Design a protein with these regions (language model features):
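N-terminal, active-site-proximal structural segment of metallo-dependent hydrolase catalytic domains
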Residues: 15, 19, 30-96, 109-114, ...
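Sec-exported extracytoplasmic/periplasmic mature domains
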Residues: 67-71, 92-98, 125, 201-208, ...
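Active-site environment of divalent metal-dependent phosphoester hydrolases
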Residues: 46-47, 81-85, 112, 186-188, ...
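Metal-dependent phosphoester-hydrolase catalytic domains
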Residues: 190, 194, 201-213, 221-315
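Active-site neighborhood of phospho(di)ester-bond hydrolases with catalytic His/Asp-centered motifs
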Residues: 75-77, 103-106, 214-218, 251-252
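Bacterial Sec-dependent N-terminal signal peptides
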Residues: 1-34
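Active-site metal-binding loops of divalent metal-dependent hydrolases
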Residues: 42-43, 79, 182-184, 218-219, ...
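Structured beta-strand-rich core segments of catalytic domains in phosphoester-bond hydrolases
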Residues: 77-180, 184
Length: 315
């Protein structure tokens, strides 16, 4: 091959790399902070009888995927807290993420037994505000542990939320982010709509209204559902009344992949469905650099019954 051909080949090979460098450089000029890496994952509860896909047979694979991403924040759903260490998913995941703190409690009456919507955060970079953190229930009595209002709802649903202060070399930078993690109901459409409304009301009423928001969750409904459209700022009819969302979120995946059609996130340990029911939402002031549905397999098996999703966010 002649010198000119080699030069041409090198130019072609370098173009994608150069484009990525230019893109990241552009974001770094527009947004002063280091990007925020986020993962949302429904871990599939450890107490389920899943045969070959039982928790004991997939937990190492799943935590390998979580750890590999070097994430700032990880929102997990169906994360079991249990006195039995073999079933305690929060404890196991924590043991594999030594550099991360963890915040969350069970959605049931007992804070340490049941499924939790857990937030893992990188301790080197983030300090959780002890005065601005909460778990609330998606019910008419949000401060009552284990509460639910809709009789058609499958179980109590909760939201874990906290304000985080960014650190650099152990000192606050002055920059802050709110993080919310939830799991909407799988049985009742009305419960999902009420849950979405209550979540958006709480976000709009947060203490520091100028601080941007990240929301992770298994919403159990597709992109065109009333609950998701409401979270993105569209009106929703509930109780024969039209409600206007008090806050507007952006779907990070759609920001990065507006034309994607292969977007199913529930796989049932088999083949994925067509609907995207897992989300990472962000405030409009935050910009998505990249977002992905992680379909990694090991020996023909998935790490959980939902595909993990991640996003890299500029701020």
């Amino acid at each position: 091959m002649g010198a000119s051909a080699v030069t041409a080949l090198n130019n072609i090979t370098m173009r994608p790399f150069c484009f990525i460098v230019v893109l990241l450089s552009a974001f770094s000029c527009l947004f002063a902070g280091e990007p925020i890496r986020v993962l949302s994952i429904n871990v599939r509860l450890s107490t389920a009888n899943d045969g070959e896909n039982n928790w004991s047979k997939r937990k190492e694979f799943m935590t390998d995927i979580i750890a590999a991403g070097n994430y700032d924040f990880i929102g997990t759903q169906e994360t079991v807290m249990n006195p039995d260490p073999e079933r305690n998913q929060v404890s196991y995941i924590s043991s594999k993420l030594a550099g991360h703190g963890v915040f969350g409690r069970s959605r049931e009456v007992s804070p340490e037994v049941g499924e939790a919507m857990t937030i893992f955060y990188k301790k080197e970079r983030w300090n959780m505000d002890e005065t601005d953190q909460t778990t609330f229930w998606l019910s008419d009595t949000p401060d009552v542990a284990g509460s639910k209002t809709d009789p058609k709802a499958g179980c109590p649903r909760s939201v874990t939320a906290a304000l985080f202060h960014e650190l650099k070399e152990g000192k606050p930078t002055g920059r802050k982010i709110y993080f919310y993690n939830t799991h909407l109901d799988h049985m009742s459409e009305e419960a999902r709509q009420r849950g979405a409304k209550q979540l958006m009301d709480r976000i709009a009423a947060r203490k520091n209204k100028d601080v941007p928001v990240i929301v992770t969750g298994d919403m159990n409904c597709g992109e065109r559902s009333p609950a998701i459209r409401f979270m993105k700022g569209e009106p929703m009819t509930l109780d024969e009344k039209e409600w206007i969302s008090p806050y507007k979120l952006t779907d990070s995946f759609r920001s990065a992949n507006p034309d994607a059609t292969d977007v199913g996130t529930f796989n049932g340990f088999k083949e994925p469905g067509k609907s995207k029911i897992d989300y990472i939402f962000v405030s409009p002031s935050l910009k998505t650099i990249s977002a992905e549905i992680i379909r990694t397999q090991r020996d023909g098996r998935y790490p959980t019954d939902h595909f993990p999703i991640d996003a890299v966010i500029a701020w």
